[in-house]
Amino acid sequence: DVGSFQGVFDGQSHVVYNLYSHEGLKSENKDNNNNLYRNGLFGAIYNATVQNLGIENADIVIPMNDTSTYGKGILVDWMTHSTIKNCYTTGSITGGSYIEKYIGGLAGFLNGNNSISQCYSTAAITGNYDGEYYAEQEGGLEPMDCWDSLGGIVGASYTGQVTISDCWFGGEIVVNSIQAPVGGIIGYGKGVSMVNCLVATKEIGNDGWENTYWLGYVVDKDAKNCFWPNDAKYN
């Protein structure tokens, strides 16, 4: 939680225009916190509330040589025990996948118990993999596969209990040559409940369609009263 925003940020319906970040972090600059380089408006929030805020025409690119891990989002990169309410994003976020990235139109990675409500994104989200990531293994350096996770609202959540309610996604998700669960609301979620959510676009896919989900790949929880383009409903 060191360096995280803690408290209440009320945007009072203001809009941040043209948020720009094309920066990355290389391994030679690593510190004890594993270089959690931040690209979103809020790099990290902890026990916080962010509400009533819009971001329009964002332009975020995470370079291929970036070695920081985990969450990348337009509004928040890393979210812990926090709440986001009545916020939206437009623009684009593009991830290079030198190391795993969890990329979301609103928030990148959720840690612990979190709530996101009354939010939407129409952002273009892109994941890429250049096949040039090597890691130290027994016997020397070996090429490694990278496991990204991309979602219209949230990239991924692995711990805690999360509720995403009254949210919708209307942008696009493009994944090029990468192993990645892809979802219109969340890429991968464990302990995530989705309620009253909508995916209003068919522009969602990756090289392996078996990893693509209208709402998201969710374990241990479910979705209620949610809709996606083929007019099906999941209860």
What are these regions (language model features)?
Residues 1-235:
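Predominantly extracellular beta-rich ligand-binding scaffolds that present long acidic/polar faces
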